[in-house]
Structures are given as structure tokens and as C-alpha cells.
């Protein structure tokens, strides 16, 4: 607009107001373009020189020179006009821009900031340098021009304005450089991957990094651990829920520990002793085993010596590991000190052939056991009936107690009340004694089972052979509680079977028929094994048939051995059949000969005329292993005179009164220690007393 007006005719523009003195250095005034500055200069020039002189137009060369180069205008112009072009007058430019217009090295004019007024206009000199405000002098870059603007905040205190926190001011003022990011990474990574995890994707890089030390996790080798795939035998039943329907073949979800790892060195040591003692000469029949001469437990230990039936649980393994080892090695020190050279040489050879660790361990055991049993083996000669052979007899007057003492954990089972007795006697099959017992002995009879334990055999007889009443007696209340709970398991078995199979023919043929039907059962046996029986507890009902299972079975806690003989005389007949299976040893050890005789006499008086006693005695060779359970058992063991092989003669003597007896059979068992003969004693129909 101004240029267009200048081309046509000159016109007057009022001069801008002079800048304030306190804002002269701030550069905050209005900015006037160069053509306006030239125009105002011309107006002032015309006013000073007179109205007759014409001002150059905006399009003239002089005006163009004045717009393009203030320095050139200063040379061509004179006086105040040149100062006007250099100083910038009404532009109120900043001090930085004013310095750009001056040549380098030129000093400021002496009339800086001085106002000169003409006749019709106002002339302004170069702007004054900025005045310090609030005690802070802004920093000027040395090279001139605009640099990075610093934060103009108050640090000196006093004065107004916004103030930042002190710690931020100090950090900003004192920091000369920006933060430096890390560049050296020990694992070879970068700022985005400091741990160099991406290198694990490359197997070659991973192998290179881990050549010396595993600085980073290596990649897993492919195919190092092959995946095992188990293919089930029956693809339609991969979990084998319907395959094992027989209770004997049920595999529990959490199987019981067999305890074989505790005795892993015992079998090897027994074999060495047996090989060493095979050349010894003993006045024993050829059919008798050698091991009873060492520890008196040959019947139950022979399978271990020959290495047979390793998987089957062995008897009395639950709490007698220390006693078994002590008694096995106890005769060796006496043999070494004995007068016979033939007895001392073989044990020495066995010690030398054993490994160093095992031999040192057994040597310590020998020293301990020799002190405890030196008196028991030393002295005069003993009889062969004691089961000690030619290893020396025993004095009945002096038997020192074992140095190891009697442990409470062993005392817990001093009556043979093992809670898992049937577990290691019949690990995967039914009780072998059921095959030698005849159903006609029990059908419709009153039966008493002494030492029933958890009642498996008692419940089997009550369920299969239909006795009129079946009473299970045991001295341990915990076993009786378990026996009562087991009734539900047998009821669950009946629920699994079809109704027509419940009434089968007795005997072996009936058992086989029942087994065939059980295999066709579709109920998962694993559910019963893991979750318990599915049958509800039985509620006694009035008028129910007491001869039908489970109403015909009851379990009672009590001690069958009476304290005095006069109590035996008061016993009245109540039962037709009495079962005494694997009980005589525990009665013998806890109550001696007198207690066992009282039990036999009470059984005879408890039977009705024509009744029978089913007896399964333990052999004398199994007594010695249990003699250290308690102090009472230890003393009774050396006082026993009535041996198991004499039971038949005593029961048929006038002291008891049985009329006859017979050997039924010797049931087969995986452990020869449980292969015990079963005898049947008959009570006369017209008793003599």
C-alpha cells in the first residue's frame, strides 16, 4: 500500500512514537519494514530540506539501494539519513539484529540511544545496550547472531517472576552437557538389547559366545532329550480304568513303599556269609538251611539269599532293619575268637572280599553286637533245639540286654499288629490260606478269628462261605477300626457284581466262576482304589437276617490271653470254629509258655463239642528276629521251653484235651517265610472234661 502510494504521489505518514527507555534493549517495539523506514526518512529529509525538493520514489534506484543495503545507503546519503538507515530508528530492532547491520570491529557511535528531533519528524539513534534486569545479565554469544536460548530464570534471589525449584535450577545451570547413553555392552548388545538376547537366535553366535565361559544362556541342543511316548495297551482305555477289576490286581494311585532301598546291602552281605559258611561242618540235617544257624530266621530269609522274588515285599520289613543287620553279623566276632580254626577262617575271607565301605560299616556293627550278645553266646554247650546249632549254647541264668536298647517305634508292633501285614504277605493275589480252608467248616457255623488284623481273611470267609456269625478279635484298636472300614470295600465289590453271581457254588470251582464274572465288570476299579469304597455304611435294621453278609460279621478289640488260670476254668463254649493263624509266636514272646498254654486251654473250652481249631504256628526260626522288640520279649525268648514242633503233642495231651489233629496243607506263598503248615485239631463230641 505504501509503495503504491509512493509511486503516484508523495504523502505524509506520522512518525511512530519514540521507544521507552526501559525497553530500549528488549527489542519489543513494533517492527517497521525497510520500505517504511525509507519512506519515513524521505519525509524527514523533505521536511528538513524544504518542500521544494522532491523525494525519490520507492521504485527509484536510490530507494532500492536503501532497501537492499543499509550500508550503501549510508555512503550515498548524508547526515541523519545515513544514521537512520544504520540505526534502525523506529524499527526498534533487537540488539542482535543491530549488530548484524554494523561492520565487524566497528565501535558503537557516541550518540547511542540519543534522540534527535527534526522540524517535522522524529529521529532515533541506534538502540541502547540492554540494561541489567533483576541483577541478571543475559549471555551473548560471541559470534553474534541467535544461539540457543537459555532458560531465563531467576537464580540470584530478589525480584519478581516465576522461580523453579532450587534443585532443578542448580542442575540446569551447572550442567555443561547432556546425559551420555551407554555404548559399551559387555555381552555385545546395544541400547535396545543390552543383554544381547537376540544373539541366542543364532546358534553359531551362541557357540562363539560360550566358547570360553557361559556368558549367556546357550541354545538347547536339538534332539538331546528325546520325548518318550507311552502307547497304551488298550487304545480304547488309555488309563487302564477297566482292565484291573479284581481287588488283588488293583494298582493304587499312590502305591505303598516297599522299603527295599533300606536293605540294598543286606542281601549281598548275606550271600557272602552263606558262601563263606558253606564249608563249615555242623551237626544239622542236610535239608536244614544254613542261615538259621546265623540269625534264626531262615524260613523268611531264603528267598533273599538266592536272589528270588526281589520285587515281592518281604515279611517284617517295616521297622526291623537295624535288628536284622545286627543279628546277621553278630555271630562273626565269636567265631573269630573261637578255638576252632575252621570256624574263624571263612568269616575273615568274607570281610576281605567285601567292598571297603561296606566292610567298615559291618565291622562297626560287629563290635557293637558282640558286646551285647557275648554273654548270650558264651559259656557251655546248648541244645540244637534252640535253633543255634554248633554256634554255642545259652545260659538261662544270665542274659544281658542288648546295648542298642529297645526303641519305641519297634515297641509299637510288639504284638505283631502290623498295619500293612496283608500288603506284604499277599502283595498281588488273594490269601493262599483260602485255598486250603474248606467252606463246609464255616457254613452256618459260629466262627472266632483270633488276631484278625485288618480283617481281610475274616471278611472273605464271612462274604463267601456264609457263616452264621463271624467274630474278629485283635488287641490293636486301630486295626479293628480299619477292619470295620473294610466292610464297605467288600460291599462295594458286591455292588459291582451282577446279582446272579452272588450265590455261586462253594469251593474252588465257585471261586473261579466268581473271578470270571469280575473280569466282565465295567465299573472302574481305579476309582475304588483311589477314592475309597462306593458303598454306604451299613445301618443295623431291626429284623434283618444276621446270617447274611455284612450282618454276620463283627470286630472286637481285646486280649484273648487271660491273666490267671482260674479265669480259664470259667470259660463257656460259644463257637464251632476258632481260627488261630500266625498268632502263636506273638503270644509266646509277650506272655511266655504260661500265656500260650492258657490261650490253648481257653480255645478248647471256648469250642462246642465237635468244634475244630485251625492252627497256623510260626516256626521257631522266626522267633529270634523279634526278640529285641521289648525287654519282656527279650527275657521270655530265653525262657521258652515249649517249641512250635511240640504244640501238637501238647494240644492232644490231657492238659488241653483235643482228641485228634491233622495236617491240612502248607499254602504256597511267594515268600517262603509265609509258607507255614496249617493244622486242624478236633474236639470230641463228648468231651472228657
From Swiss-Prot:
PTM text: Dephosphorylated at Ser-152 by the PNUTS-PP1 complex, promoting RNA polymerase II transcription pause-release.
Keywords assigned by UniProt, alphabetized: Acetylation, Isopeptide bond, Methylation, Methyltransferase, Nucleus, Phosphoprotein, S-adenosyl-L-methionine, Transferase, Ubl conjugation
Catalysed conversion reaction: a 5'-end triphospho-guanosine-ribonucleotide-snRNA + S-adenosyl-L-methionine = a 5'-end methyltriphosphate-guanosine-ribonucleotide-snRNA + S-adenosyl-L-homocysteine
Tissue expression pattern: Expressed in chronic myeloid leukemia cells, adrenal gland, brain, cerebellum, kidney, lung, mammary gland and testis. Weakly or not expressed in other tissues.
Signal peptide: none
Ranges where the Bin3-type SAM domain occurs: 431-686
UniProt record, GO biological process: negative regulation of transcription by RNA polymerase II; positive regulation of G1/S transition of mitotic cell cycle; positive regulation of protein localization to Cajal body; positive regulation of snRNA transcription by RNA polymerase II; RNA methylation; snRNA metabolic process; snRNA modification
Keyword Methyltransferase: yes
Modification type N-acetylmethionine: residues: 1
Molecular-function GO terms, alphabetical: 7SK snRNA binding; O-methyltransferase activity; RNA 5'-gamma-phosphate methyltransferase activity; RNA binding; RNA methyltransferase activity; S-adenosylmethionine-dependent methyltransferase activity; snRNA binding
Modified residues (Phosphothreonine): 213, 291
Effect the entry attributes to changing residue 421 to A: Nearly abolished methyltransferase activity
E.C. code: 2.1.1.-
CC per GO annotation: 7SK snRNP; nucleus; ribonucleoprotein complex
Main location: nucleus
Functional summary from the UniProt entry: S-adenosyl-L-methionine-dependent methyltransferase that adds a methylphosphate cap at the 5'-end of 7SK snRNA (7SK RNA), leading to stabilize it. Also has a non-enzymatic function as part of the 7SK RNP complex: the 7SK RNP complex sequesters the positive transcription elongation factor b (P-TEFb) in a large inactive 7SK RNP complex preventing RNA polymerase II phosphorylation and subsequent transcriptional elongation. The 7SK RNP complex also promotes snRNA gene transcription by RNA polymerase II via interaction with the little elongation complex (LEC).
Protein name: 7SK snRNA methylphosphate capping enzyme
Provenance organism: Homo sapiens (Human)
Source species taxonomy: Eukaryota, Metazoa, Chordata, Craniata, Vertebrata
Recorded name of the encoding gene: MEPCE
